[in-house]
Each structure stands twice: as C-alpha cells, then as structure tokens.
Amino acid sequence: MSSINDPDAVRREYADEKRYAARMAKQETATGPDPYEVVFGAVAEQEPQEVLEVGCGRGELAERMSRELRAHVVALDQSARMVELTAARGVEAIVGDVVDLPFRDGSFDCAVAAWMLYHASDLDRALVELRRVVRPNGCLVAATSSERNLAEVWELVGEIGAPGGGFTVESAEPALRRHFGHVEQRDVFGTVTFPTREAAHSYIANTRTAETADRLPELDTPLVVSRHVAIFVCAR
C-alpha cells in the first residue's frame, strides 16, 4: 500500500483544504472541456432522484447536483474537514470509507466517484460496494486522470508519469468491467498553463511528490502542459 491509498495518509492529506485548493488552482488556466461538466452531464443524463458521491471534497459537485438536478444527494468522505465543508453547503454529508459503505443494497440511482478511486485501500472491494448500493438500473460515474496527465511538468522534475495509484485512465476500464456489465469511456483532453515557475512549484509542492518541487528549473516562458482525464459511465 502506498501513501495514495493508505487511509491514514489520505486523511492527513485532506485534514484541511489548503493543499487541495492549491492543486485545484491549475484549473484557472485550463483549456478544453471542463471535466467536472462532463461528470455532471453524465449524472444528469440518468435523471436520478437519489445520488451518492464518494470522495466529495469541498462539496461543490454535490451541492450542484442537489440544486440543479433536484436530487437527494448524500456525500461521503474520509476527511472530517471535507464533510464539514460539504455540510455547510446544505448537503447531507458523512464521514466514511468507500470500501465499507454504510448503506443498504440498491439505495441510489447513481453513484459518483470523481478523482478518488485511486485513494481506495482495496479497489475491487470499493467497486463491489459501489455496485451493491446502486439500483439494478442505476449507474456509477467515475473519473480519473491519465498516467500522462500533466506529463511535461513531471518530466521537468524527473518523474516518470503523473503520481497516481491503481486507478488511472489506462487501468480503469478493465477494473470497472470486472464489476459492471457496460462501461463507456469519455476522454477529455486539453492543456493547463503554469504562468510562472512559482505557480508550477506551488502545484508540485502540494502533491505526494512535494520533495521534487525544488528540482524544477527556471522557466523563461509560461509552461503549457497537456491534460488527459476520462469519465467512465458504468451500468450494472
């Protein structure tokens, strides 16, 4: 088990929102489709009444699903702080772990796991649990990043591929097909620009490879890097 899917390490990382916010700042310079819009659209297609979001973070997506889809949304996260932030948005939120969901079979029309399944201590167990709590005609919407996501910045600090775990764009489909009968992959490509060395350094310093940030060379021009993520719509 690595730090990316060690429950204690994950709870420490998300004990407050500062590191998460620093990583999300890169979205301000992103081009191409907004991956979170693709996730939201995939959920909206299902016209769900009951939605579970695991790994809810600060609760932006959960709040939007509740408001715009008029769905009952339950949000779950390992981090008490993230649950607190989500609850402050008026969303029902609880502390919990995706590998042991505290819900009855078939409780939800749709489950959402956006950029979090690489944190699962046991990926297959997490997928078993997500399938269990989704109704027979329901779905899972999962999202993750490619091993080559933001590759150019990682190469500058001597990393081979983006820091990740056992759930990447490249490995997700076979894992999902072990538990779901139909899996549709929706790729999203674009770029992210780090306008200065300081911006790139701040991003790296708030990831699991923070110790590599000081390897970043001086940048004479803004650093434009490629982005590749994918959303998977999975039916039982």
Language-model features and meaning:
Residues 115-116:
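Short catalytic micro-motifs in class I SAM-dependent methyltransferases
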Residues 124-136:
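A short glycine-rich, Lys/Arg-flanked "PGG" loop and its adjoining helix->strand segment in the class I
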Residues 112:
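A conserved beta-strand element that flanks and buttresses the S-adenosyl-L-methionine
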Residues 1-47, 60-61, 139-167:
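Conserved class I S-adenosyl-L-methionine
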Residues 48-49, 106:
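Nucleotide donor/acceptor-binding cores
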Residues 3, 32, 163, 167, ...:
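Conserved Class I S-adenosyl-L-methionine
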Residues 50-100:
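Class I SAM-dependent methyltransferase SAM/SAH-binding core
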